């Protein structure tokens, strides 16, 4: 006789408001999760996803105060009554910001901390640590202090530390937001292993919708503290309008199926190819809505973008940290004025290290850098910063004023801008970024997306010719991500700014970048348009990158790299024959 697995998580009519806030972060939420299930929770920033995660292991309200009502039962315990110490052995929680849970002197010490507190023998602890570090590509970094890791390596360390505890329940709150595409794939592979081999229950809070299709048993979509949609991946992702309204990006294969009027919406690349091969589609009379109406669909070569003069020149640059580790190895690069460049590559490839040389935050061990035709050697950082603005990956690292308005005026005042000009620039930028109503608000009270916009705007206020943004979309939902990138593109197209982004998001690269610089092991390994880079599988593998799924589809169908589902649908409607039998 078949028996259903018992519920391991039960939340009934749970409502929560943070201390001092009248807004309900969770509003009458109920959910049951069976042992061994993988549940994906999607939704915009501020929907209540992280609040839900913290309630499951007792962090709320044990450490984060507020008003909690309703019933919560996790593995037979009430988390806030059992306490976080007892819950930690049952529920492993990985936060989206790794700095909140890294505190060891070395990577190995950090990964070993959790299993060491389970009373295990030393040999078992080190066995788990070694495996977890290997799974997360951290082998060789055992003795490195966590503060000297890249953002992605920090995130990998936090995940490894929780995995080493082998908890019954894994709650992963945007665990891949800082990881390169191969790192993301490894995390999802580990999730699958935990579920299938160890019987673990997994709660996965994510923005990476393409990977969820084949991983989650059920999907829940949250908005404004409530569940708006729930069901199997096919049931949920078929409701494309509702997903867009909730700030969730529709997977490329699903969007393409809708655009071509597929008889049955495909959910894998193989299903897309079979749909096209069998002719199980008909061009809709009214075109379906597309998420990717921006791009750059052309197949222009890089040469067509190189008419402007270089604004940044890098010649034979090497950089070594005080430890002797070489982070940059013979870099030669030119960035032309008015370009939109994405610098991509695996975690630790040297992307951030390179770009911090452009405004003097770092100085090369050897080699030369020219900014606007002038050698950067000996030029004070404050002078370079007036020409090359830098937005850090974590906005909280550069927000420190007491109000939003003061934050926007700080940089311009520092570089000697006239008071009347500062006032007019601040007013204009407040309107541009949609933060006028928050002018007198303390920045820490803003959402992550609002803080990201403020950090960007505080640099834009200084009117630099070059703007570097390190991971502009980390922790943001799809709507917020596009708002940030649309703003950057507007600065380039209308004001002639040169934009450089560092990103792991190939969907963002395909939509916005005119040029892609690929780094690996401290070197520039490739340079071209998105189409040119995505058409080089060896280069993509070397840099631990994965192209958007629609590029895989169009490559298989026509031997072409197209960047959006809309482009692919138009190509199909053109009636040209397929490249291969599918």
Each model region followed by its residue ranges:
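Conserved ABC ATPase "signature" C-loop
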Residues: 224-225, 521-522
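Conserved ABC ATPase signature
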Residues: 145-149, 153, 442-446, 450
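Helix-to-loop junction immediately C-terminal to a conserved catalytic motif
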Residues: 57, 359
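Conserved ABC ATPase "signature" region
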Residues: 123-141, 420-438
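The feature captures the beta-strand-to-loop junction immediately N-terminal to the Walker
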Residues: 42-44, 344-346
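Catalytic Walker B motif of ABC-type/P-loop ATPase nucleotide-binding domains
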Residues: 170-173, 467-470
């Amino acid at each position: 006789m078949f028996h259903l697995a018992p519920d391991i998580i039960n939340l009934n009519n749970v409502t929560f408001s943070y201390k001092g806030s009248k807004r309900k972060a969770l509003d009458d939420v109920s959910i049951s999760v069976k042992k061994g299930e993988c549940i994906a929770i999607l939704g915009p920033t501020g929907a209540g996803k992280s609040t839900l995660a913290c309630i499951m292991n007792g962090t709320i309200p044990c450490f984060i105060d507020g008003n909690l009502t309703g019933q919560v039962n996790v593995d037979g315990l009430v988390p806030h009554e059992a306490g976080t110490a007892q819950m930690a052995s049952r529920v492993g929680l990985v936060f989206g910001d790794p700095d909140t849970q890294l505190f060891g002197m070395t990577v190995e010490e950090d990964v070993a901390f959790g299993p060491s507190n389970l009373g295990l023998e030393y040999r078992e602890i080190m066995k788990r640590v070694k495996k977890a570090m290997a799974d997360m590509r951290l082998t060789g970094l055992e003795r490195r202090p966590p503060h000297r890791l890249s953002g992605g390596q920090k995130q990998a360390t936090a995940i490894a530390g929780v995995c080493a505890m082998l908890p019954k329940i894994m709650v992963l709150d945007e665990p891949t937001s800082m990881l390169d595409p191969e790192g993301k794939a490894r995390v999802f592979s580990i999730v699958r292993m935990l579920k299938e081999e160890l019987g673990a229950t997994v709660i996965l809070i994510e923005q990476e919708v393409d990977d969820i299709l084949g991983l989650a048993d059920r999907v829940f979509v949250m908005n404004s503290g409530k569940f708006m949609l729930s069901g199997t991946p096919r049931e949920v992702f078929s409701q494309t309008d509702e997903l867009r309204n909730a700030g969730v990006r529709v997977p490329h294969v699903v969007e393409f199926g809708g655009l071509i009027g597929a008889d049955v919406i495909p959910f894998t690349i193989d299903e897309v190819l079979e749909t096209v091969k069998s002719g199980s589609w008909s061009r809709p009379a009214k075109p379906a809505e597309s998420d990717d109406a921006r791009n750059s669909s052309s197949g222009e070569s890089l040469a067509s973008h190189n008419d402007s003069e270089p604004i940044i020149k890098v010649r034979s640059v090497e950089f070594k940290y005080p430890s002797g580790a070489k982070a940059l190895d013979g870099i030669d690069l030119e960035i032309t004025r008015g370009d939109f460049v994405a610098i991509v590559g695996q975690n630790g490839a040297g992307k951030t290290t390179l770009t911090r040389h452009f405004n003097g935050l770092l100085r090369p061990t050897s080699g030369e850098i020219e900014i606007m035709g002038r050698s950067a050697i000996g030029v004070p950082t404050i002078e370079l910063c007036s020409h090359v603005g830098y937005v850090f990956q974590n906005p909280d690292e550069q927000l420190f004023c007491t109000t939003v308005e003061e934050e926007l005026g700080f940089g311009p005042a520092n570089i000697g801008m006239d008071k009347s000009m500062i006032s007019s620039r601040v007013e204009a930028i407040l309107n541009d970024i949609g933060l006028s109503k928050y002018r007198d608000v303390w920045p820490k009270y803003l959402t992550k997306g609002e803080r990201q916009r403020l950090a960007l705007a505080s640099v834009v206020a200084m009117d630099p010719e070059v703007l570097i943004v390190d991971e502009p979309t980390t922790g943001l939902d799809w709507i917020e991500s596009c708002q940030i990138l649309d703003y950057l593109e507007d600065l380039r197209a209308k004001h002639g700014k040169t934009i450089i982004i560092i990103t792991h998001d190939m969907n963002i690269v395909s939509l916005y970048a005119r040029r892609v610089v690929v780094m690996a092991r401290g070197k520039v390994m490739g340079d071209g348009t998105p189409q040119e880079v995505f058409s080089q599988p060896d280069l993509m593998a070397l840099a631990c990158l994965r192209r958007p799924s629609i590029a895989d589809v169009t490559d298989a169908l026509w031997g072409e790299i197209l960047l959006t589902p809309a482009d692919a649908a138009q190509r199909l409607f053109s009636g040209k024959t397929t490249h291969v039998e599918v």
